[in-house]
From Swiss-Prot:
Protein name: Elongation factor 4
PANTHER family membership: TRANSLATION FACTOR GUF1 HOMOLOG, CHLOROPLASTIC, TRANSLATION FACTOR GUF1-RELATED
GO BP annotations listed: positive regulation of translation
EC category name: hydrolase
Presence of the UniProt keyword Cell membrane in the record: yes
Localization per Swiss-Prot or TrEMBL: Cell inner membrane
Keywords: Cell inner membrane, Cell membrane, GTP-binding, Hydrolase, Membrane, Nucleotide-binding, Protein biosynthesis
A GO molecular-function descriptor: translation elongation factor activity
Function: Required for accurate and efficient protein synthesis under certain stress conditions. May act as a fidelity factor of the translation reaction, by catalyzing a one-codon backward translocation of tRNAs on improperly translocated ribosomes. Back-translocation proceeds from a post-translocation (POST) complex to a pre-translocation (PRE) complex, thus giving elongation factor G a second chance to translocate the tRNAs correctly. Binds to ribosomes in a GTP-dependent manner.
Coiled coil: none
Catalytic activity: GTP + H2O = GDP + phosphate + H(+)
EC number: 3.6.5.n1
GO cellular component entries: plasma membrane
Length: 609
């Protein structure tokens, strides 16, 4: 049993690529969590995709024992949290399990957008924040400049910021000493009824669901009968332990400590992040605060390129769901693309990661339809039906235009950091996406002058390709972060694409009336280049309701029917041409247009011109 005053729980906050995982590696090495042979780069990022993109997706924890300069041995629990906005709820749960945080800032790049979002969350949890300036051995490093930036932008006192270089191992001892000295120990009562917060969970093929917990009061031991207060299920604990990053079984997890439990649970669904665990007998009267159901924000259709892969896709999505309860899916069928799934995600990065994991880990080729968001549609009262409010995320379910009273769409508050040179292009991009500018300030010194601009933007304009466009016009220098700010009324319409007068369901979009014509024209032009010519003329149209707003025509291929006539009377040729004309008219009426798979994929990648 560890004395409470000797425990330190902390997380590491950093923007992507500022060296968070490398610093974690060094801390593990110095405290002897792994032998030199077992040490690998980015120990805590288990998935390949986490290592490749240099991002952390699932929260991980490590328990380290450190003997400080005062001769005492401290138990340090490091929570490695995701840094991306899509996983903000996971971050907030991980932060709630700690008392302090290391704020890691790259000495060459300074403070970025996502650092800020997570720092503010950390401050809300009343954390003690220890600034760490990393990568000080880079030639472009300006530690003093960054120190001033931390004080200006975040308002933290950075006079005692720890200077380190995680890669070359400079200053790691100083970081550990700062953790012991500055971060407060947790509070908790060993004899009170058990209260433990569920920080994260994942599926292990041998153990079932592994649950990461932070014990607030009481003690977790093997053989305890526990109840999940929000989920309402009961389980028998069959293993308790911690990670050093290796799995180590322990006799108990006491108050203030972070560890894991398993209870032969088969589905991650039952172990929801943020739930409270207590004993079945004499349990805690009420759960911990801060639990909420995670709602998907962005939706899109996932279809296999080869229809025969549908079963494989169903299986793979089921397996992914075991590990990631925050994404939801339901079956959907489309006339153009066959059977597939409609899936909901926490945000764009989440969508990309799931897509990439499906194609990489399960070897699937997928078509994804245009991402859409959740619209709240108020339907007017009619003779036969009452007025009601419905939520729609699939353009196929769009109600009759005449019944719609008001449509509300989700808006976000976006914070963009960019070097001054690219500001004009970025403001134009936000303007084109119906953004409303709310603030513009400058931060940093002469050599690192950057603009911080905040915009209110409709989420539906951001899900498409906003992030890619932002990165390309700023040559990768701009950083972007967003939070949701509720719904607002919008003049939205459903745009259908008709090929040979038949609507193609997979290409319908919900767009704002002001940009409908432009989008429709772009889509028609693109399809005109992609659909092969047939023996008859094919009209491609974009329509809102019954009104056609854009049209392109694919010219027919002409077979030379008069080639075999040699000399002779003109009426012979006329007869053949008339016959061809009639055949074409009949063909146009009954002919089927085949739209190649590539056309779908390319048409859905609009906005990249």
């Amino acid at each position: 049993m560890t004395d409470l005053s000797k425990i330190r729980n902390f997380s590491i906050i950093a923007h992507i690529d500022h060296g968070k995982s490398t610093l974690a590696d060094r801390l593990i090495q110095v405290c002897g969590g792994l032998t030199a042979r077992e040490m690998s780069e980015q120990v805590l990022d288990n998935m390949d995709i986490e290592k490749e993109r240099g991002i952390t997706i699932k929260a991980q924890t490590v328990r380290l024992n450190y003997t400080a300069s005062d001769g005492e041995t401290y138990e340090l629990n490091l929570m490695d949290t995701p840094g991306h906005v899509d996983f903000a709820y996971e971050v907030s749960r991980s932060l709630a399990a700690c008392e302090g945080a290391l704020l890691v800032v790259d000495a060459a790049q300074g403070v970025e957008a996502q650092t800020l979002a997570n720092v503010y969350q950390s401050i809300e949890h009343d954390h003690e924040i220890v600034p760490v300036i990393n990568k000080i051995d880079l030639p472009a490093a300006e530690p003093e400049q960054v120190r001033a930036e931390i004080e200006d932008i975040i308002g933290l006192d950075a006079s005692e910021a720890v200077m380190t270089s995680a890669k070359s191992g400079i200053g790691i001892e100083d970081v550990l000493e700062a953790i012991v000295a500055k971060i407060p120990p947790p509070e908790g009562d060993r004899d009170a009824p058990l209260k433990a917060s569920l920080v994260d969970s994942w599926y292990d093929p041998y153990l079932g669901v592994v649950i990461l917990v932070r014990v607030i009061d009481g003690v977790l031991t093997k053989g305890l009968n526990v109840r999940f207060m929000q989920g309402g299920t009961q389980h028998l604990i069959d293993r308790v332990g911690c990670f050093t990053p290796k799995r180590v079984d322990l006799p108990e997890i006491g108050p203030g400590e972070i560890g894991f439990i398993t209870a032969q649970i088969k589905e991650v669904e039952q172990a929801r992040v943020g739930d409270t665990i207590t004993t079945v007998k004499n349990g805690a009267p009420e759960p911990l605060k801060g639990y909420k159901e995670v709602q998907p924000v962005v939706f899109c259709g996932l279809f296999p390129v080869d229809a025969a892969d549908f079963e494989k896709l169903r299986e793979s999505i089921g397996k992914l769901r075991l590990n990631d309860a925050s994404f939801s899916y339901e079956m959907e069928s489309s006339a153009a693309l066959g059977f597939g799934f409609r899936a909901g995600f926490l945000g764009l990065l989440h969508l990309e990661i799931i897509q990439e994991r499906l194609s990489r880990e399960y070897d699937l080729d997928l078509i994804t339809t245009a991402p859409s968001v959740v619209y709240t549609v108020h339907l007017a009262h009619t003779k036969t039906e009452d007025a009601k409010v419905i939520e729609i995320h699939n353009p196929a379910d769009w109600p009759d235009v005449n019944r719609i009273d008001v449509i509300e769409e989700p808006w976000i508050k976006a914070t963009i950091y960019t070097p001054d040179d690219y500001l004009g292009a970025i403001l134009k991009l936000c303007q084109d996406r119906r953004g409303i500018q709310t603030n513009l300030t400058y931060v940093g010194g002469a050599s690192t002058l950057r603009a911080q601009v905040t915009y209110d933007l409709p989420l539906n304009e951001v899900v498409f390709d906003f992030y890619d466009r932002l990165k390309s016009i700023s040559r990768g220098y701009a950083s972007f972060d967003y939070e949701q700010i509720g719904s607002r009324e919008g003049d939205l319409v459903k745009m259908n694409i008709l090929v040979n007068n038949e609507p193609v369901d997979a290409l319908s979009l919900i767009v704002h009336r002001s940009v409908a014509e432009e989008r429709g024209r772009g889509m028609c032009e693109r399809l005109k280049d992609l659909i092969p010519r047939h023996l008859f003329k094919i009209p491609i149209q974009a329509a809102i309701g019954g009104k056609i707003i854009a049209r392109e025509t694919i010219a027919a291929l002409r077979k030379d029917v008069t080639a075999k006539c040699y000399g002779g009377d003109i009426s012979r040729k006329k007869k053949l041409l008339e016959k061809q004309k009639k055949g074409k008219a009949r063909m146009r009426e009954y002919g089927n247009v085949s739209i190649p798979q590539e056309a779908f994929i390319a048409a859905l990648r609009m906005g990249e011109e």
